[in-house]
Amino acid sequence: MSSSENICVVIPAFREAGRIGAVVRAVRAQGLAVVVVDDGSPDATGAEAAAAGATVLRHATNRGKGAALHTAYACAREHGYDAVITMDGDGQHDPADLPALLAAARTTGAPVDVGNRMADAAAMPRVRRWTNRGMSWLLGRVMRQQVPDTQCGFRYYRLAVLPTQPPGSTRYAAESELLLDLAARGVPIASAPVRTIYRDEQSKINPVVDTLRFLGMMLRRAVRRR
């Protein structure tokens, strides 16, 4: 990335009232614009994000994280941004790591930098640690380039490399599918260490259901290649 890049932070959010406002304020304090896609939340997620200084787009119904990110990328393009950083809205991704992620993107020059939580994964719930490592290993084999933490949603993307068509997977598997698409096109993918803040709230990720969706996505791609 260049020092003159115009960058915004995009946050897909579903039922994040009570958390999203603090995330947006922490990002805005660093001088970055924020686009939040309220993915059909029944609570005050969108209102809290707007009050904290974000541009808020809303899906009338819950369409999934992949669909929300696609909406955010389209908005960033329309507003002339060169690159985006994706973050979760629940506070797990520490906005204090934004400068480090941007510095890594400048250092590597890669159009994609994926956060790596695995260097300090002790606080990660054990099941998620195992599934993350397994998915990252499998994706790395298919991609033919190693990304230590393919399941981390704290990422830097240059918009020019992102597809403009909607993702085949609209939920959590969409981020893995995107990495596969980028690797297939020969796009370099770098990594940068980031922290994750785990709280007592139940994760929206279902290890069984979302792992099955991930495997289903991998199977569909394998069938299409034959």
State what each model feature region is.
Residues 61-78, 95-172, 198-209, 213-219:
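Acceptor/aglycone-binding surface of glycosyltransferases and processive sugar-polymer synthases
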Residues 8-12, 58:
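Short hydrophobic beta-strand elements that form part
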Residues 6-8, 177:
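Cell-envelope/extracellular polymer assembly enzymes that use nucleotide-activated donors
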Residues 81-92:
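Short beta-strand-to-loop acidic/aromatic patch adjacent to the donor-nucleotide binding site
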Residues 18-22, 43-52:
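Acidic helix N-cap motif at the loop->helix transition within catalytic regions
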Residues 13-29:
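Short, well-formed alpha-helical segments that are part of the catalytic scaffolds
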Residues 38-47, 91:
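A conserved acidic beta->alpha catalytic loop
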Residues 145-146, 167-170, 179-196:
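Catalytic donor-sugar/metal-binding loop of nucleotide-sugar-dependent glycosyltransferases
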